[in-house]
């Protein structure tokens, strides 16, 4: 099923009575309540939910818990709190046979193997570069070697690397790959074999772009990009302004995701899980890139300009400075274009570590396709900058860390009032706004 067919199955009217409000006051300094989602109608026989936490040195990590789905479940982060509220009965989904289905080229994961990944303990997909490993660790090692990437550990170079925490520290993950026997020369030999086939490398790269066209990713960015010719300085509290802008952007975020190649081919519940896992990073990346044109502040989709001094006066200067320094300034310095922004956001969207996914391998493959298409794009568009692809990927850890801190600072606390984000996204996906 192609993307247009997947979207046609969702073409209904917007759910009535949906309203979103801001309730920032009275919550500062108090942890939000735990999530108690009941999504037993979505996953069977078990479902897993994850949360972000902080590892040593402030590095982000993913933690998870696995519980039977028939009853309400709780998700709690000891290190931080998510912008959530208690949740009533979620809208029931009826996934008809004509609904979104996985692409024929992306078979559902049904492989059972007796081997586990020597690096993180996840299920191994085979022996890669001399070691039984999962697709995630295989791809991580291959990118590290091919791009000659270097990492730094923010702790004592002894971070725990397992299925839940493998994204915490890239340095320690790479060192564990080496210590468990992964061979750098195996990656290089693999690449050499491809080159010896003549045009094979070009065909492979071109094929990746055809399956994940950057042109379509750019179209998704342009379709939801607010047209801002002029902007005015914000007068209200900057936290309120940011939350209200993000509140409105959640609508366009769902529409953006549906335009990303293959997203609507995933199971509907997986679409919700991916958006739930990445919405904060996706929004932050968007307004950071938009703020390239702003002077010492961020430019919101509403046209309001939030100055650095206002953020400091509101007590959120530290995280605001990080946004300006680690994201906005870096994007400005390298003149990151919207195609590159869209690809980075697609990488965030296709997060195979999001807990509860049923199509983990498909999502992993889609992320790899985005990587391949982005690499091809940077090589062809910026041939004089051979390190540009790696430079782009280095923004992702900063984006993840800042996204967590923004949640911790309650930037998006009670983002949609009493409407929990899970239910809101579910309704948006099930009943999208009419195409314009």
Curated annotation (Swiss-Prot):
Residues 13-22, 85-98 have a biased composition (Low complexity). 9-cis-retinoate binds at residues 290, 301. Residues 117-182 bind DNA. GO terms for cellular component: nucleus. Residues 209-432 form the NR LBD domain. One of its GO terms (molecular function) is nuclear steroid receptor activity. It is found in: Nucleus. The keyword Transcription applies. Residues 1-108, 189-209 are annotated as: Disordered. This is Retinoic acid receptor RXR. It comes from Biomphalaria glabrata. The gene is RXR.
């Amino acid at each position: 099923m192609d993307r247009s067919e997947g979207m046609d199955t969702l073409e209904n009217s917007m759910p009535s009575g949906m309203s979103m409000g801001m309730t920032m006051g009275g919550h500062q300094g108090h942890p939000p309540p735990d999530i108690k989602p009941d999504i037993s109608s979505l996953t069977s026989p078990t479902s897993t939910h994850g949360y972000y936490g902080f590892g040593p040195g402030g590095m982000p990590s993913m933690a998870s818990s696995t519980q039977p789905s028939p009853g309400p479940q709780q998700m709690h982060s000891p290190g931080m709190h998510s912008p959530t509220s208690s949740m009533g009965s979620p809208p029931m989904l009826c996934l008809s046979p004509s609904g979104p289905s996985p692409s024929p080229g992306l078979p559902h994961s049904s492989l059972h193997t007796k081997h586990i990944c020597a690096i993180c303990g996840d299920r191994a997909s085979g022996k890669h570069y001399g070691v039984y490993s999962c697709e995630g660790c295989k791809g991580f090692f291959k990118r590290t070697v091919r791009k000659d990437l270097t990492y730094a550990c923010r702790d004592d170079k002894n971070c725990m690397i397992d299925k839940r925490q493998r994204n915490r520290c890239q340095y320690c993950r790479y060192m564990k790959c080496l210590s468990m026997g992964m061979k750098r020369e195996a990656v290089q030999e693999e690449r050499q074999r491809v080159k010896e086939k003549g045009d094979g490398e070009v065909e492979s790269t071109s094929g990746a772009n055809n399956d994940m066209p950057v042109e379509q990713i750019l179209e998704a960015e342009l379709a939801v990009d607010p047209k801002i010719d002029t902007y005015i300085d914000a007068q209200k509290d900057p936290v309120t302004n940011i939350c209200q802008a993000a509140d409105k952007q959640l609508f366009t975020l769902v529409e953006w995701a549906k335009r990303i190649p293959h997203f609507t081919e995933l199971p509907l519940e997986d679409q919700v899980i991916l958006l739930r896992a990445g919405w904060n990073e996706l929004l932050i990346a968007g307004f950071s890139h938009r703020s390239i044109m702003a002077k010492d502040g961020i430019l919101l989709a509403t046209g309001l300009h939030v100055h650095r001094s206002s953020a400091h006066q509101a007590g959120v200067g530290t995280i605001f400075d990080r946004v300006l320094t680690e994201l906005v300034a870096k994007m400005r310095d390298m003149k990151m274009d919207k195609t590159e922004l869209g690809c980075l956001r697609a990488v965030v969207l296709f997060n195979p570590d999001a807990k509860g996914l049923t199509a983990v391998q498909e999502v992993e493959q889609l992320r790899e396709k985005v990587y391949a298409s982005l690499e091809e794009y940077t090589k062809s568009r910026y041939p004089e900058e051979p390190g540009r692809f790696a430079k782009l990927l280095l923004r992702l850890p900063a984006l993840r860390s800042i996204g967590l801190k923004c949640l911790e600072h309650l930037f998006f606390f009670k983002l949609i009032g009493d409407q929990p984000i899970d239910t809101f996204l579910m309704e948006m996906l099930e009943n999208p706004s009419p195409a314009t």
